[in-house]
């Protein structure tokens, strides 16, 4: 099995609330299926739906879906680098739209500062699984794929 990482560059920055109770979020496509991405990979919809369902049940719904600032080299979340918590993940066509709250951790404060200064931050997903080369020239993600985190910044 290989570490599989995908990057998506367009996320929207949202502020909810006002004053000291204001919370900063990023929202946008966190995952994509049924299209060949920039890394030359394609995730079948059935695999992505299964993994998003599992990830949502085990992590998002329990407040445990954390992500890091920076793109780690492994599939585990390093708590000292946590910057955000994924609060929603839902399917829209071939995209899975995520929403993540920027946390008040040291890395979250860096992410918040960068976003408020207009830096365009993208997200990347991480998982492990096998890849199969296709005759069309792309690699298809295998049935053994397991989503580790839906979005790191």
Short names for language-model regions:
Residues 54, 60-77, 123:
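Short conserved beta-strand and strand-loop elements enriched in small hydrophobics
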Residues 47, 75-78, 150:
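A generic alpha-helix propensity feature with a strong bias for hydrophobic helices
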Residues 10, 14, 18-28, 66-68, ...:
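Residue microenvironments linked to proteolytic maturation
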Residues 34, 57-60, 73, 93, ...:
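Compositionally biased, intrinsically disordered low-complexity segments enriched
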Residues 1-62:
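Polar/acidic, low-complexity leader/linker segments enriched in S/T/G and N/D
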Residues 32-41, 73-78, 106-109:
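Short, surface-exposed beta-strand/loop "edge" segments at domain boundaries and coil↔beta transitions
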Residues 1-5, 69-82:
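Short, solvent-exposed secondary-structure boundary motifs
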């Amino acid at each position: 099995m290989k570490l599989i990482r995908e990057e998506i560059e367009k996320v929207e920055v949202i502020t909810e609330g006002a004053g000291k109770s204001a919370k900063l979020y990023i929202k946008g496509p966190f995952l994509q299926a049924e299209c060949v991405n920039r890394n030359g990979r394609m995730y079948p919809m059935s695999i992505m739906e299964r993994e998003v369902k599992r990830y949502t049940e085990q992590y998002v719904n329990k407040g445990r879906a954390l992500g890091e600032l920076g793109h780690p080299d492994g599939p585990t979340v390093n708590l000292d680098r946590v910057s955000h918590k994924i609060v929603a993940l839902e399917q829209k066509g071939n995209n899975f739209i995520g929403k993540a709250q920027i946390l008040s951790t040291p890395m979250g404060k860096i992410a918040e500062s960068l976003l408020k200064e207009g830096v365009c931050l993208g997200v990347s997903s991480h998982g492990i699984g096998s890849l199969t080369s296709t005759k069309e020239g792309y690699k298809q993600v295998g049935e053994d794929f397991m989503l580790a985190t839906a979005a790191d910044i």
